[in-house]
Amino acid sequence: MGTRKADPRQPDKQRAVRVLVALNAPMYSTSALEAAANLAARYHSELEALLIEDEELLWVANLPFTREIDRVSGALRDMDNVRVVRALKVQRQFLNRALVGVCGKLKVSSRVRVVRGDFLSEALTAAAEAEIAILTRASHTATPPPAGQRLLRTAPARGTRRKPVWSLFDGSPASGRALIQAGTIAAEGATELVVAVPESAAGGRRKLETEARTLLGANAMRARFVVVPRAEIGALFQSMWPQGCRLLFLGRDSIDLSTRQTAAWLKQPACPMVVMA
């Protein structure tokens, strides 16, 4: 009797999986942290939080002629490098507390790594070395929030409609693994799953929809399928914008993450991306 061949799109919990979440120092969301912790728990992996501090911001703060507007009074004042560094230190403390809280509930070990540089460059470099990477947006905030300001976004108010979870499925093994996790996250959050299928995908969109429903199993009942003209961030963004997005799941090779479109995406108030190898 032959041995049944494993589906490469199904998660292999026996192998070591590196789970990483890349966070912009001035702002990060609870959705990204919770999704990362949940994925780390499923794979029995440690969660690595990469906190990226804006190197350019620190350089600007050192210039003698740099000014900033006070958030409270609106007054123009000198930009203080010492205050910026102090605020960044406070943010690391906030992140550590947030990780302890989120990961403690799931009994997931975690660690924080801090780097300074360009957010997109550092995030993509780190993502290329991880089996699962969660990328949050690059904030437009010019300076870090004051030390006492709450950094984490709060949960939606009671009665507020939950934003759907999105997944790009093109038939590749990585996009299949991403789809399975997206379905699980959507089910656990009692929210809708929107599956984006590229119109230009090989084999045709109907075949992909059938394949996606098979992979989702019982979670296919909450799935809604949309067709995007091509597998690009811009096309996805146009589809997502009217409905909103909680998380976007995709395979690492489904979209070129090094393009200007990706950089623009990560600067928008959009949802975190979960990139799976």
Label every model-predicted segment.
Residues 2-78, 161-228, 235, 245, ...:
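Small/aliphatic-rich secondary-structure junction motif
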Residues 4-5, 15, 29, 33-35, ...:
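Gly/Ser-rich helix-loop-strand patches that form or flank binding pockets
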Residues 40, 103, 127, 186, ...:
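A generic structural signal for well-ordered alpha-helical segments
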Residues 76-86:
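Short glycine/proline- and acidic residue-enriched helix-loop micro-motifs
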Residues 84-102, 106-108:
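Ordered, amphipathic secondary-structure segments that act as subunit-interaction surfaces
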Residues 95, 99, 211-212, 261-265:
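A general structural detector for well-ordered alpha-helical segments in enzyme core domains, enriched
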Residues 110-112, 225:
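Hydrophobic/aromatic anchor residues within beta-strands of the central parallel beta-sheet
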Residues 117-120, 228-234:
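Conserved active-site histidine-acidic residue motif and adjacent donor-binding/catalytic loop
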